[in-house]
Amino acid sequence: MMTNVETVVNTHNGNGAIATKIGETQTDVAALLERLAALEQRVNELESAPGQDIEDRLSMVVFSGDLDKAIAAFIIATGAAAMGMEVSMFFTFWGLNIIKKQKTYEGKNVLEKGFTAMLPAGTGQLPLSQMNFFGAGAKIIRKLMNDHEVTSIEEFVEMAQEFGVRMTACDMSRELLGVRDEELIDGLEFGGVASFMGDAARSKASLFI
């Protein structure tokens, strides 16, 4: 008789444990479904957010004013443009020397005139980042490039403009270094860091040279 009672009790307890386990599982499933729904909503929000679309675009900050780095920057820029990518180059600080065409001292203060005197007046005066040897290194590289029929930096700049590469001169750097509009090559745009960031946010790749 006791055996039958124990069996009934054990059976009752077993059913209760099973019911409890089922309840816990249902709660876990409901929580998981809720998290999945929230995740799906977040993904949809990100996909529909303005300015988040990644385009076939390359954005580049050109900070250096060295000849070898300038050549590398324009090789990449023209190569990407030739492949159909939209390319933007943001020239800041010493990179402004690459897009100069002349020097002017008119209307500048003492510090601005000092920068103008010390900095290159264009691609023809750019130094090498290594082994410049007071300008001799740059001349040697130019001769080697000419001997091997390699495109010059001047030709690369023209090619980039022909390919529709967007070139922007940094407003803040121009103001700090006293660079005037008439000192820069034609066909440039002028803007601040927000201009570059707008392009970079939509680009597949961003480079700093």
For each feature predicted by the language model, list its residue ranges.
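Long, leucine- and charge-enriched amphipathic alpha-helices
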Residues: 14-55
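Short, glycine-rich nucleotide/cofactor-binding loops
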Residues: 60-71, 144-148
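Histidine-anchored nucleotide/phosphate-binding helix
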Residues: 71-89
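Short internal beta-strands
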Residues: 87-93, 168-171
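Glycine-rich loop at the start of a catalytic domain that most often binds anionic cofactors/ligands
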Residues: 99-108
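A glycine-rich helix N-cap at a beta->alpha junction
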Residues: 107-145, 149
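A short aromatic-anchored loop/beta-hairpin motif
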Residues: 154-163, 168
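Glycine-rich, aromatic-bearing surface loops/beta-hairpins
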Residues: 169, 174, 182-185, 189-209
